[in-house]
């Protein structure tokens, strides 16, 4: 079910990892950001949009992880965009076939994969999504995944953060696609911090919507976690351990794996990250 969170902006929340699809209303139709996740959920989204007389005129994937590269036939054949690096990474990862990706990533059977990753890369350094609607700024960085983009809709006071600034997920660093995953993540947080004063509503890729009072709080929380990870300290983070939200205890395993990978990189290269 669609829920309005700002003037001309709605979200659709999936039961899979509390994933958020963002719908932005434009002049002739809507921009769809990270639609997902199960087939029945995307069919419901398509039905809700159709019932309200809305046509999808553009799509955008914030980064090249499978749950952000989805689409459903009921959403139509609008152009689907991502940053140039995001699109190139998606093509490369899908070059061995969708079935191989599904097996490696453990994608649930309820997820339709026939339209997975069919996105067009925007020219490098494109500043805004090309569509007839509110101006959507692209804030590209290299935290979490190659070509990751946050989206800022200034006239709505809205920041779509992709897989950052979540109240349920810790920062997950890209340990394989970058020379310095720690600094890349910290640089991305600084980028988001630079626009925080313009944000009244924060939409993470997974988790709860945040208000203006939570934007800097979540930035600080993510930064503190990354610092603790870098220094191999135990993070005082409510997303881990007994304070984690019910059903999210598996995030502790993600943290343990990141500690291990970062320690291996430090041993190999001599520097954290």
Stretches found by the model and what they are:
Residues 193-201, 208-273:
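Accessory terminal helices/loops
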Residues 43, 47-128, 224-228:
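Active-site HxH/HxHxD metal-binding segment of metal-dependent hydrolases
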Residues 12-13, 119-120, 140-142:
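Short Gly/Pro-enriched turn/cap motifs at secondary-structure boundaries
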Residues 1-47, 51, 150-162:
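Conserved beta-strand hairpin/beta-sheet module of binuclear metal-dependent hydrolase folds
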Residues 30-31, 37-38, 135-142, 146-218:
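Metallo-beta-lactamase
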């Amino acid at each position: 079910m669609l829920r309005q969170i700002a003037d001309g902006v709605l979200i659709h929340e999936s039961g899979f990892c509390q994933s958020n699809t963002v719908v932005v209303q434009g002049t002739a139709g809507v921009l769809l950001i990270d639609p997902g996740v199960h087939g029945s959920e995307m069919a419901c989204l398509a039905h809700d949009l159709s019932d309200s007389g809305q046509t999808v005129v553009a799509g955008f994937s914030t980064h090249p992880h499978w749950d952000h590269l989805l689409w459903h036939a009921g959403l139509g054949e609008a152009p689907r965009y991502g940053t140039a690096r995001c699109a190139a990474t998606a093509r490369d990862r899908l070059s061995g076939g969708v079935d191989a990706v599904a097996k490696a990533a453990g994608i649930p059977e309820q997820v339709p994969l026939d339209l997975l990753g069919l996105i067009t890369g925007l020219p490098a350094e494109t500043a805004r999504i090309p569509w007839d609607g509110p101006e959507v700024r692209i804030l590209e960085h290299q935290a979490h995944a190659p070509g990751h983009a946050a989206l800022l809709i200034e006239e709505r006071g809205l920041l779509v953060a992709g897989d950052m600034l979540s109240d349920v997920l810790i920062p997950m660093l890209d340990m394989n696609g970058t020379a310095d995953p720690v600094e890349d993540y910290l640089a991305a947080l600084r980028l988001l911090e630079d626009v925080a004063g313009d944000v009244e509503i924060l939409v993470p890729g997974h988790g709860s919507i945040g208000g203006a009072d939570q934007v800097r709080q979540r930035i600080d929380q993510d930064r503190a976690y990354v610092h603790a990870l870098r220094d191999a300290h135990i993070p005082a983070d409510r997303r881990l351990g007994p304070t984690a939200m019910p059903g999210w205890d598996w995030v502790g395993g993600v943290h343990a794996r990141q500690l291990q990978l970062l320690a291996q990189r430090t041993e190999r290269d001599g520097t954290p990250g």
